[in-house]
């Protein structure tokens, strides 16, 4: 973490934070979340299991969208915790486009998840749709559920952004790379009057598709 801070204030402010979010105790699946500090844009990707191989697969999916050059443009610094799912430092760093003599992947100090507090705080918004302790089965989640959830989360105006939305701010900051990433994961703009940050949003969409409830 000291090396992360040594990047300087501007680089730290422009970094990403990476974490995982768990569902019910009996689930194998979990979510990989990536938060872009400047825009507050958060992605949530489904992992079949909370392990380093699944994290690498998810980041590989992002790399397939952006390409090697795009990964280097977008993910200049990523801060995560010391969870076992992030233990394959070499694989993650390579996927981020880390070159010889540089570092793009950084770790919080042990037991200091507050050092990536923006990601943790934004999980509050995600948990409005997927509340903890409600018995929701992440093993049943589909990419369409996450696309819907993150479209709503990232369309909520934020005071820190001058009441713009994370999705709009992200596109303004990262242009075509941002548009490609959001399109690939189905994250679109939701009008203010249509915002729904309640568990019913996903359950209604699942019912319309004929999918079983999450709980």
What function would you assign to each model-found segment?
Residues 69-74, 100-102:
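Short helix-terminating capping/connector loops at secondary-structure junctions
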Residues 23-27, 44-69:
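Active-site beta-loop-alpha junctions of metal-dependent nucleic acid enzymes
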Residues 90, 132-215:
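C-terminal domain-tail junction helix/linker
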Residues 40-45, 132-134:
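Short small-residue beta-strand/loop micro-motif enriched in glycine and branched aliphatics
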Residues 18-19, 40, 78-81, 116, ...:
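Short, conserved catalytic/metal-binding motifs centered on acidic residues
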Residues 1-31:
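Mobile-element integrase/transposase regions
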Residues 80-82, 89-96, 104-130, 139-151:
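RNase H-like two-metal-ion nuclease catalytic core shared by retroviral integrases
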Residues 36-37:
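Short, acidic, Ser/Thr-enriched surface-loop or helix-capping motifs
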């Amino acid at each position: 973490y000291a090396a992360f801070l040594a990047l300087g204030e501007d680089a730290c402010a422009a970094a990403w934070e990476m974490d995982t979010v768990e569902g019910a105790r009996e689930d194998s699946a979990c979510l990989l979340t990536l938060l872009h500090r400047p825009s507050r844009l958060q992605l949530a990707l489904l992992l079949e299991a909370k392990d380093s191989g699944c994290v690498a697969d998810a980041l590989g999916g992002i790399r397939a969208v952006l390409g090697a050059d795009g990964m280097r443009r977008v993910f200049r610094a990523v801060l995560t915790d010391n969870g076992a799912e992030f233990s394959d430092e070499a694989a993650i760093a390579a996927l981020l486009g880390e070159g010889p003599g540089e570092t793009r992947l950084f770790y919080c100090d042990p037991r200091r998840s507050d050092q990536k507090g923006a990601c943790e705080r934004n999980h509050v918004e995600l948990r409005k749709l997927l509340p903890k302790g409600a018995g929701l089965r992440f093993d049943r989640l589909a990419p369409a559920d996450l696309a819907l959830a993150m479209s709503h989360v990232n369309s909520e105006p934020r005071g820190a952004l001058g009441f713009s939305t994370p999705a709009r701010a992200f596109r303004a900051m990262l242009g075509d790379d941002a548009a490609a990433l959001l399109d690939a994961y189905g994250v679109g703009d939701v009008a203010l009057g249509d915002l729904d940050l309640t568990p019913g949003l996903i359950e209604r969409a699942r019912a319309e598709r004929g999918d079983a409830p999450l709980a």
